[in-house]
């Protein structure tokens, strides 16, 4: 165990003495998070999350600290772990732990520690269970569902398909040996989950299609004020921040390969082009490929790009987008990184047999048998959080305002005993999306034009909104 913990307290962080530093940065972040702070002010008196016990699995950053304190200000009880072994900002974790909120996170966790910490968010000090999940990537949701399956048939854990699954399955077996009904007991208590990111949402839809999902879920990722802002504008700033901090390379003139041209890929490509890289895009989807081509990017295959690129960024949410053979073809000193949620976009396992030389934390040379070296950042995990500090506070305010509203929506309906959200996956209604945008605009001194009665009638909308149909593509 690398982290320092006080066993008298219900937390595990790197160094609790970092709390004062974290508190100062949290105060700055609050000034850059208008949407989230406005929601805190609006609902503090009514306490809509009173009674909610939220198990949170999301990057433990300064911005997440503001989210946690907003949830608490609205009445929730919270336990927290990071959803990535490299993404924790240790001073942020310390600042939250110092307030009495249980936090289990430090930068550079092992996979064994990661799954231990994810279990800890379900282990309430009073022996009870959480009743809500706030998830990023779906690991907390997966843990309960898979664990409950294993209670009935442990053979579901017999064949791990990756290093990650090896540690996950071992953690579940260890827990079952101590508490045979841990997962089903927690699963039965959960009223709903709000999911932050594309990868986690994909998991939720798959579970729902298979009839395995056990509670309602709100897909926060597909709120316009999340996906079109966090995914695009957030990545546009944080990708290059991570690459620069890790390598100090000049980006201008280099050939940068962006794998995937969704919202994350669009932001990543814009960032690299803004620094005068020659940006090439790989895509499977002809619509996204056409968008990239119309923006002036060269659209190629990874097989072709591998030997030409200087910088490679995966943004797909898919599996083995960069393979061993691709890396074997790359130039000496090519930089390889990922800004999708999981580390399997790059086939890291296939190059673990070679010599690795750590340059500094989260920056490694992989040395091939012929002596060629490539630079892998954050061991294939999120480069913007592994090698930098993630997205700026302002854009995370939009995402976390949506998360808070979604938690309120699911919890208040559960308390009322309504049937508004039977088991399934939902998105927030348009008027709440627009509300988040209005709250964010105030910080930018933007002035909205107001429709006249005639104009509203002409286009068939209310003067107060929503202004677009659900099928509108922003």
Swiss-Prot record:
Pfam families: AdoHcyase, AdoHcyase_NAD. It catalyses: S-adenosyl-L-homocysteine + H2O = L-homocysteine + adenosine. The keyword Transcription does not apply. GO terms for cellular component: cytosol. PROSITE patterns: ADOHCYASE_1, ADOHCYASE_2. NAD(+) binds at residues 197-199, 231, 260-265, 283, 318, 339-341, 384. Pathway: Amino-acid biosynthesis; L-homocysteine biosynthesis; L-homocysteine from S-adenosyl-L-homocysteine: step 1/1. InterPro entries: Adenosylhomocyst_ase-like_sf, Adenosylhomocysteinase-like, Ado_hCys_hydrolase_NAD-bd, NAD(P)-bd_dom_sf, S-Ado-L-homoCys_hydrolase_CS. It is an enzyme of class 3 (hydrolase). It comes from Ralstonia pickettii (strain 12J). It comes from the Bacteria. The gene is ahcY. One of its GO terms (molecular function) is adenosylhomocysteinase activity. PANTHER family: ADENOSYLHOMOCYSTEINASE (PTHR23420:SF0). This is Adenosylhomocysteinase. Its cofactor is NAD(+). Binds 1 NAD(+) per subunit. GO terms for biological process: L-homocysteine biosynthetic process; one-carbon metabolic process; S-adenosylmethionine cycle. Belongs to the adenosylhomocysteinase family. The lineage of its organism: Bacteria, Pseudomonadati, Pseudomonadota, Betaproteobacteria, Burkholderiales. HAMAP family: AdoHcyase. Keywords: Cytoplasm, Hydrolase, NAD, One-carbon metabolism. It is found in: Cytoplasm. Its main location: cytoplasm. Substrate binds at residues 61, 136, 196, 226, 230. Its EC number is 3.13.2.1. May play a key role in the regulation of the intracellular concentration of adenosylhomocysteine.
């Amino acid at each position: 165990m690398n982290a320092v913990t006080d066993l008298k307290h219900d937390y595990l962080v790197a160094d609790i003495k970092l709390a004062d530093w974290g508190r100062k940065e949290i105060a700055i972040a609050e000034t850059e998070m208008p949407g989230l702070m406005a929601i805190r002010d609006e609902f503090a008196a009514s306490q809509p999350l009173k009674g909610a016990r939220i198990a949170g699995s999301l990057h433990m950053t300064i911005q997440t600290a503001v989210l946690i304190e907003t949830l608490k200000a609205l009445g929730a009880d919270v336990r927290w772990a990071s959803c990535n072994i490299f993404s924790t900002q240790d001073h942020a974790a310390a600042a939250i732990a110092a307030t009495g909120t249980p936090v289990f996170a430090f930068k550079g966790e092992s996979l064994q520690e990661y799954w231990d910490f994810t279990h800890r968010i379900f282990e309430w000090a009073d022996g009870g269970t959480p009743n809500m999940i706030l998830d990023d990537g779906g690991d907390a949701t997966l843990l309960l569902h898979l664990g409950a399956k294993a209670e009935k048939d442990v053979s579901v854990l017999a064949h791990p398909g990756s290093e990650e699954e090896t540690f996950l399955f071992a953690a579940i077996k260890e827990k079952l040996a101590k508490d045979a009904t841990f997962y089903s007991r927690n699963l039965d208590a959960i009223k709903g989950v709000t999911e932050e990111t594309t990868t986690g949402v994909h998991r939720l839809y798959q579970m729902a299609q298979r009839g395995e999902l056990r509670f309602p879920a709100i897909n926060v990722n597909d709120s316009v004020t999340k996906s079109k802002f966090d995914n695009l504008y957030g990545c546009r700033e944080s990708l290059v921040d991570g690459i620069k901090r890790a390598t100090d390379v000049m980006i201008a003139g280099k050939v940068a390969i962006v794998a995937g041209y969704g919202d994350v890929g669009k932001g990543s490509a814009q960032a690299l082009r803004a620094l005068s890289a020659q940006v090439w895009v790989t895509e499977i989807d002809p619509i996204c490929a056409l968008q990239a081509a119309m923006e002036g990017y060269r659209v190629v295959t990874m097989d072709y790009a591998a030997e030409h690129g200087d910088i490679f960024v995966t943004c797909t949410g898919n599996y083995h987008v960069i393979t061993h053979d691709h890396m074997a073809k790359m130039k000496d000193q090519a930089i390889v990184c990922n800004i999708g949620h999981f580390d399997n976009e790059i086939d890291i396992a296939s190059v673990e047999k070679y010599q690795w030389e750590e340059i500094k934390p989260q920056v490694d040379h992989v040395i091939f048998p012929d002596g060629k070296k490539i630079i892998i950042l954050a061991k294939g995990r999120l480069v913007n959080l592994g090698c930098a500090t993630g997205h700026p506070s302002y854009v995370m305010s939009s995402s976390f305002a949506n998360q808070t509203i979604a938690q309120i929506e699911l919890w208040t309906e559960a308390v009322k005993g309504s049937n508004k959200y039977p088991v399934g996956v939902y998105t927030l209604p348009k008027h709440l999306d627009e509300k988040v945008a209005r709250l964010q605009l105030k910080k930018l001194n933007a002035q909205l034009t107001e429709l006249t009665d005639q104009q509203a009638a002409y286009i068939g909308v209310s003067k107060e909104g929503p202004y677009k149909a659900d099928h509108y593509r922003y």
